């Protein structure tokens, strides 16, 4: 009964039926469009754009637009999309995943929805896994779009900023997923709006979508710089702070744990370090180091706040008294304590910006993708990306022979059998593709084939250009190719002359992958577009996946039957057990990716807030009101900490507040206790703000409107960038240590969300305090440049194009862009990075 209901109400069938009707409408226009001249066909683009301007939607134009691309493709490339390709294109336009078997023409399928969505002028991104495929598709398919009057861009790692901006400004941009992610991060580190390269993210079509959104989902893209200041400054600040005396040179409030230099302390600092004004923008880093050294000596107590164990500073949880191993204080405080205790000062975090593919691609207004294998991950695509997987029928029925698994006792027996099978097929001239899970297996089989004197090619996904060439030739008579399962994706294996008669391409799998999807990809290499082919997996009881579900019992059974190492078994029971083991592993992997996303969502929300505000800063002509509001918040906090509601006004430490305000915001003697005595807390805030506004207006009068506006931007950008980078580091440390605090009845994710939110609020307050302090106390230099602000920052800044992406071998894998010290600086100053952004104070 259930089976009948499923057939009647199967949503996939309904979707396919709907797409088929639409495809019939497109096909019905074929003859009319064939009669159009080239110019008339080109003019369709102008006509469609006009219709969109008049209020029609892209959905209204679908049938005609698809018919236009179909005819243009026939004229330009000689390829005429089949009906199933039209259906695949409709699925892509609707923001779904088209599951189309290998060889069904996914690349051509994408041209139709890409053209339709590019008509709005907002830009469409076609995403591939490597630059070779991006270049190839831009070259081959780009001709169709250019014939129809649209512009095509190719975004490569080697391009400079102007070339990248041009590539993104095109109607259609081909790029790799890595480059898109890194460009997004770089755009949110620029100092001028004009330096940005990407437009708002509109629509993306991802080729090999399962590889990018699932296999690489847990890979964070990280832009990192070399530590822009040496650890020497911590040691110097530590030595200086040891010479200071409490009350004379600094004040300490035990309740708020805040330590402040007095005027005398500042004078000593300026003398000790040979500078004129400690609050000058140039000396931001020095000021920060002194403040942290003071805090380390005065506010942080050994064996109370931290302990020293095996040469490491370990934080003590103030609530539980437990040691929080793996956690470090942020903003350089940990390094300051290390200097205080005479330990080796560790380098600070160098992460400048980070995002995962999951969160990058979820920012697009509309997202779609193509692959030959997505159905097994349908739930993940639906839950995380809100995309449905639509299995598109093949143009020709699949006649490939998928044979049952052959299972051997040992790996040695299995590999010998594989080599023997390859040798027999080689003798007949049938091409063979041997798929392996690991590079070591490829090398082992290569050795066995060499011993048998069989010529072959080994592929290990290092050289994309060469890889595609080898894969293309893998269908020729007598070809033997050994490849890791993922190698050569996106390149078809076309059968050579006379190969069909030999049974087509033989695909041999040397073990089952933990994901059924990867096994299906390997099978899909054979039998494209109705071609013949066979697939055969060889397994052994020693394979990792087999060991997972209790191969010992089966081994004992084989021993009882007296089976030797040369005889395989074909058992449905074992094959089913393998599949259920794969399903379990897939489920576990999905759960871990889902959990990662829940943790990553905390940082995503914070990143969106910071990047949005940062853009508003570089986009704004006048930040005065924003800066005044920041100062107001900072003053309210300062006043609040000295005028607690639970104390009587007579108990308020107003002398401490006056010292703080005069030192950090106004000038010595600007306000006195007498000025604020007897006032309510909000009256004190208003009084101080009036004095601050007077100082602000006087400063504006002195320097002029234009210079003051640029000065505000410099100060705000410096504060936002340095505090955000510290915050990324702190969140990373919190994330790594949070599971250690999963005490009874505690949900670590909830703890991470709550603590992460508190840390974000603290960061915002810290930004406001920094802006208030430096806007009021720094002097403006005549040749003020935004780039100079970064020299005083706590970390390095933006990478250059052409930098290496390196993968750090940690779990999860991280794709990192490093900044070379001799690279030209991103800011356009013409200086080397080490003499500009990477300059050490």
UniProtKB/Swiss-Prot annotation:
Catalyzed reactions per annotation: ATP + H2O + cellular proteinSide 1 = ADP + phosphate + cellular proteinSide 2
Gene3D superfamilies, per the entry: Helical scaffold and wing domains of SecA (1.10.3060.10), P-loop containing nucleotide triphosphate hydrolases (3.40.50.300), SecA, preprotein cross-linking domain (3.90.1440.10)
Positions annotated to bind ATP: 85, 103-107, 492
Cofactors: Zn(2+)
Basic residues compositional bias, start-end: 829-841
Gene Ontology CC terms, in alphabetical order: cell envelope Sec protein transport complex; cytosol; plasma membrane
Family annotation (SUPFAM superfamilies): Helical scaffold and wing domains of SecA (SSF81886), P-loop containing nucleoside triphosphate hydrolases (SSF52540), Pre-protein crosslinking domain of SecA (SSF81767)
Listed PROSITE patterns: SECA (PS01312), SECA_MOTOR_DEAD (PS51196)
Top-rank lineage group of the source organism: Bacteria
Record's subcellular location: Cell membrane; Cytoplasm
Membrane topology designation: Peripheral membrane protein
SMART domains reported in the protein's UniProt record: SecA_DEAD, SecA_PP_bind
Molecular function as annotated in GO: ATP binding; metal ion binding; protein-exporting ATPase activity
Note on how the cofactor is bound: May bind 1 zinc ion per subunit.
GO biological-process terms attached to the record: intracellular protein transmembrane transport; protein import; protein targeting; protein transport by the Sec complex
E.C. code: 7.4.2.8
Binding sites annotated in the UniProt record for Zn(2+): 825, 827, 836-837
Record keywords, A-Z: ATP-binding, Cell membrane, Cytoplasm, Membrane, Metal-binding, Nucleotide-binding, Protein transport, Translocase, Translocation, Transport, Zinc
Disulfide partners: none
Region annotated Disordered, chain positions: 788-841
Database matches in CDD domains: DEXDc_SecA, SF2_C_secA
Family, per entry: Belongs to the SecA family.
Assembly description: Monomer and homodimer. Part of the essential Sec protein translocation apparatus which comprises SecA, SecYEG and auxiliary proteins SecDF. Other proteins may also be involved.
Name the record gives this protein: Protein translocase subunit SecA
Lineage: Bacteria, Bacillati, Bacillota, Bacilli, Bacillales
